[in-house]
C-alpha cells in the first residue's frame, strides 16, 4: 500500500543556507522527512519530524509540492514538501535517526546528498506560485540497493530491540 510522507526544506533566515541531516541508517544527507501519523496534518508531521531529526522547532512557510515516487517499496510513496524556518531548539538535541545536522549553501551540498533532495531544494528556491507535482523515477540498480538496505536496517533494528 502506498504511503504518504512529508519533507521540509528548512532555510536560514537569509535564505543562503539549507538545513540537512545525515541519516543514521544509510549515512546520506537529506531533509527532515517522515510518514504522516494517524490524525496528523501535513504541517504537524513536518514540524514533528524536523524537531525529531534535527533538534530544531520550525514554522512552516510555504507548500512546495507533491512528489510521487512509485518505485519505492510498499507500493510507492507520495512526499509533500514544505519550506520552513527555525524558530527555536538546537541541533545538539537531534534524535537518534541523525548522526549530524548541518547548514549548507544550496550550491555546495555534500556529495552524499540524495538526488531527490537536490530537486526539492531547487524547487523550493524557485518559489513558484503554483505547487509542483512530479513523478520521480529511480534507476533499477538504485531500487535494488535501497530494498537491500531496508531489509538490512530492519534486521539490525530487530537485533537492537532484543539486546
Predicted regions span which residues?
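Active-site segment of metal-dependent pyrophosphate-handling enzymes
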Residues: 55-90
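Short, well-ordered beta-strand micro-motif
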Residues: 10, 81-85, 102-105
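Structural detector for helix-capping/boundary residues
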Residues: 34, 48, 61, 104-107
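Conserved N-terminal beta-strand and adjoining loop/helix that marks the start
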Residues: 1-18, 35
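Short connector loops at helix/strand junctions that flank enzyme active sites
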Residues: 3, 26, 31, 75-79, ...
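Nudix hydrolase/Nudix homology domain
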Residues: 27-28, 97-163
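Conserved Nudix-box catalytic region and its N-terminal flanking loop in Nudix hydrolases
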Residues: 16-52, 56
Amino acid at each position: 500500500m502506498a504511503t504518504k510522507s512529508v519533507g521540509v526544506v528548512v532555510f536560514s533566515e537569509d535564505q543562503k543556507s539549507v538545513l540537512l541531516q545525515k541519516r543514521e541508517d544509510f549515512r546520506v544527507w537529506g531533509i527532515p522527512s517522515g510518514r504522516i501519523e494517524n490524525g496528523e496534518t501535513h504541517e504537524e508531521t513536518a514540524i514533528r519530524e524536523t524537531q525529531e531529526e534535527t533538534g530544531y522547532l520550525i514554522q512552516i512557510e510555504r507548500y512546495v509540492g507533491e512528489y510521487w515516487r512509485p518505485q519505492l517499496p510498499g507500493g510507492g510513496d507520495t512526499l509533500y514538501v514544505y519550506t520552513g524556518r527555525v524558530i527555536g531548539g538546537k541541533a545538539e538535541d537531534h534524535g537518534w535517526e541523525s548522526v549530524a545536522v548541518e547548514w549548507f549553501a544550496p550550491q555546495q551540498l555534500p556529495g552524499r546528498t540524495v538526488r531527490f533532495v537536490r530537486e526539492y531544494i531547487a524547487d523550493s528556491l524557485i518559489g513558484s506560485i503554483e505547487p509542483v507535482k512530479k513523478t520521480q523515477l529511480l534507476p533499477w540498480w538504485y531500487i535494488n540497493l535501497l530494498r537491500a538496505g531496508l531489509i538490512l536496517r530492519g534486521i539490525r533494528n530487530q537485533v537492537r530491540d532484543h539486546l
